[in-house]
Structure formats: C-alpha cells, structure tokens
C-alpha cells in the first residue's frame, strides 16, 4: 500500500533513524512488525467487530507481551487527526491490513508502468494477477483485495482502488484493528502534542 521509503523494512528503518528514532536516541531497537515486505502477519479476531471480523496484524506485534506506544499527535487528511488509536490500528496492520482499512475495493494495474516482471504473480496466494502480452492484469474474481501485489511491484504499477474507505469507515476500521491488538493485553500509551503537522508523518 505504501510506496517509497516505507515500502520495505530496510528503508523504513533507515528513514526512522534519519528522523531520530534509533537505538541510540530511544534505547530501543526498531522492528518492522510485518517483516521485510509486509507479508508477515497474524490473523486476529476482532471481538465485536462490525466492519472487520478478523484483523491482519504484523506478526511481531502480536508476539509482544505488552504494548507501549509513543504517539506523535498530528492532523491527518484521511482521518481528521492521528494519535494512539491511529498509531496502534494503522501502524499495527500488515500491508494487507492497511489495504483493508484504507480501501473497500481491489487494486488495478497501470499498463503504462507495468514491465511484465511477474513479481505480482509470484506474491499472490490466490492466482489473481496474470501476465498477458508482457503486461500484468488482475482477475477481479480471484482477487481478495489484500494488497500484497502493490508492495511487490518494483515499478509501482499496481495501484490501490481509486475509491477509498469513507472517513467514518476508515476511523472505525482503525479502532477495530487497535482493539484486536490491545484486547486482553497490558498496554501503556503516551501521546505528545509537539510540532503538530497538517499531514501524516
């Protein structure tokens, strides 16, 4: 779902270090919970979930004994604002989980950008992407909308659905994801209101 420096764990960690989140400044190591490419996930039941019955959570987060979150409170165009619930819910979701929260549909492929490499075909567990005439296409009947193909594409040719979740649905899905992560586990949250930015950081 995310492109650029948050597309895979190594560059994500480098970006964190450059922004002051390193073991030297925080005393904690950084682990990207859903693994190198966002595919290491645990399926977690959402107690009483209305929009999400089973959340796709980064596996390393579900292996933790306790959740301690340090949140930068800020504005968000998609959700209005972001704090602990957004940090836990969206941040804890695997790539497929983030896709589920952000979108109600299925990805599509830009033929102009596609080079026919087959990365999307190899990552898909459902056989939805196919290569025809040296270009990938998605069989929407087979696609489950998990978004793994988005992260696998080296050319950013696989795009999320144009119609995203409404703000109300997105906020509710994030809250349900946060509930799936926190339910029945000890947790502690600190939110800082400093350098409030108008967009997600």
Model-derived features: where do they sit?
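Extended, low-polarity segments enriched in aliphatic/aromatic residues
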Residues: 2-201
